[in-house]
Amino acid sequence: MMVKQFDHTLDVTVSVVLNLDARLPSGMARPLMETCFSMTRGVCEMLEEKRIQYAFCTNARAAGQTGPWEFVSDGLGGAHLSTILEGLGRAACQATRSRDTLLDDVRRRAESGRAHIILTPGREDISPAQVRALSNYTGAKVLVVSAEEVTAP
């Protein structure tokens, strides 16, 4: 009989991706982008609590950001989280590049086995084909969380 055991030597890594290139009417976009900032903070804090290394990638513009912001490489701990939180605190509700360019960059940086959590304002922002392509490339799960779905009544 074979028993499948969890391999504790495997490092779980995650990329947290914040997209602000939304397909929403302008009146709806800003509040949903603000919700995305909160969701991103919550996801990063949860990964910190679980001691899971994570990278961060975004297309959000950050006013006066002093350090790296659009891509923060794998890390864990207070300094890593602070870099991301500082950017979220300075973030404007404006994208620096398209969602397609962002996801192309994410896919180029992706590694086999790396999971992805994509946070986005609208339900329609990320296509199923984009999710499938990233999942097929890494062989890992891709979770898309839309602020529109989270805040829906």
Indicate where each model-derived feature is located.
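Exposed, interaction-prone extracellular/peripheral surfaces
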Residues: 1-153
